[in-house]
């Protein structure tokens, strides 16, 4: 009887062990599948991850989209060219020594070429890239220090070279032409800044760091002065929130960056995370952080989107192609809101000088 009892116990223990092993393997498989479906950016803390420095980069070398420019030789860019002259944007890109070749060079090869001036801000100087050395340490706890010092550097060296000053990450993709249209309605001498507006912790809201944000010249002046007079201090390592608190203290307005239809232009994730319904779980922090009611699916994003975040190098080039090269034959753009009245007159004059009789509607059709 005793031997039978021991046999039952042994059988139970063996069965439990086998069950545990099989269960562990099954859970491991499920977690791997979940990891593939929900990429690592889906942290439940909006400040838990910024730009990973240890991601695998599967892209060797840079790509030159200008190498095949023959199809664009007759492209009419008069309006974009006029905006480039009238709405001058200095872009500074937050990066690090280990990311210059992994990420920053792909920013440099794509959207950064459309900035009026671009600077890459790192903890160490690199004269070959080149990158500005801010003499900080690397790490998430240094993000706000890097931001403060970067804006101070820009203020001291390039204040008169631009009207607007944009901060972006080395995994952010920015459509500068759309940003210029957005900013063309505003005066850079007014204290205002734009980005993806979040609402917690700051009464007027603050701008998401990853989606990028842009300060008017007056906002930049006030920000730098605030650290000289101790109106603002390094109050937190959470860069975007800390900067937002400072902006509120110094009476810099958190601007509305939505387009004329109410759609968002700055996006804290890659396009598919906003476009695919159900991709971001309802328990995810994102749904509680948006200042304006968030939309998922095709209505999520403006046709004149300004930025996307968590863009790896391969996707950087994909977006470059989709934004500036892919066209459906035979279509005029369906959504192209008018320019401000003063700028519209200036652009119209270009066509008049070319003996083109232009009013606002033909102007929209001509710039495709």
From Swiss-Prot:
Enzyme class: transferase
Main function: Glycosyltransferase that generates the core 1 O-glycan Gal-beta1-3GalNAc-alpha1-Ser/Thr (T antigen), which is a precursor for many extended O-glycans in glycoproteins. Plays a central role in many processes, such as angiogenesis, thrombopoiesis and kidney homeostasis development.
A Gene Ontology biological process term: kidney development
InterPro entries: C1GALT1/C1GALT1_chp1, Fringe-like_glycosylTrfase
Annotated metabolic or biological route of this protein: Protein modification; protein glycosylation
Species whose genome carries this gene: Bos taurus (Bovine)
Known cofactor(s): Mn(2+)
UniProt-recorded name of the protein: Glycoprotein-N-acetylgalactosamine 3-beta-galactosyltransferase 1
């Amino acid at each position: 009887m005793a031997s039978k009892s021991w046999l039952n116990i042994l059988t139970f223990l063996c069965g439990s062990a086998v069950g545990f092993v099989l269960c562990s393997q099954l859970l491991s498989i499920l977690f791997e599948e979940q990891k593939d479906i929900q990429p690592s950016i889906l942290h439940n803390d909006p400040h838990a991850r910024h730009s990973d420095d240890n991601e695998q980069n599967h892209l060797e070398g840079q790509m030159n989209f200008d190498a095949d420019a023959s199809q664009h030789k007759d492209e009419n860019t008069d309006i974009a060219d006029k905006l480039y002259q009238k709405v001058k944007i200095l872009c500074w890109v937050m990066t690090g020594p280990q990311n210059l070749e992994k990420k920053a060079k792909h920013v440099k090869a794509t959207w950064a070429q459309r900035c009026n001036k671009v600077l890459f801000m790192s903890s160490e100087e690199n004269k070959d890239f080149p990158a500005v050395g801010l003499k900080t340490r690397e790490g998430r706890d240094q993000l706000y220090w890097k931001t403060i010092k970067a804006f101070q550097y820009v203020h001291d060296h390039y204040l008169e070279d631009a009207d607007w000053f944009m901060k972006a990450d080395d995994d952010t993709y920015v459509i500068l032409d759309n940003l210029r249209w957005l900013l063309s309605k505003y005066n850079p001498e007014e204290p205002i800044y734009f980005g993806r507006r979040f609402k917690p912790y700051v009464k007027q809201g603050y701008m998401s760091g990853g989606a990028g944000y842009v300060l008017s010249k007056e906002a930049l002046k006030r920000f730098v002065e605030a650290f000289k007079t101790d109106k603002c201090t390094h109050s937190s390592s959470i860069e975007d929130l800390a900067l937002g608190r400072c902006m509120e203290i110094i009476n810099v307005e958190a601007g509305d960056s939505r387009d004329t239809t109410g759609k968002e232009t700055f996006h804290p994730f890659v396009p598919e995370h906003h476009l695919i319904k159900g991709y971001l779980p309802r328990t995810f922090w994102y749904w509680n952080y948006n200042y304006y009611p968030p939309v998922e699916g095709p209505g999520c994003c403006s046709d004149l989107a300004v930025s996307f975040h968590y863009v790896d190098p391969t996707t950087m080039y994909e977006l470059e192609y989709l934004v500036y090269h892919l066209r459906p034959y035979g279509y005029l753009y369906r959504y192209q809101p008018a320019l401000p009245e003063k700028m519209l007159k200036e652009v119209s004059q270009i066509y008049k000088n070319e003996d083109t009789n232009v009013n606002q509607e033909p102007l929209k059709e001509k710039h495709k």
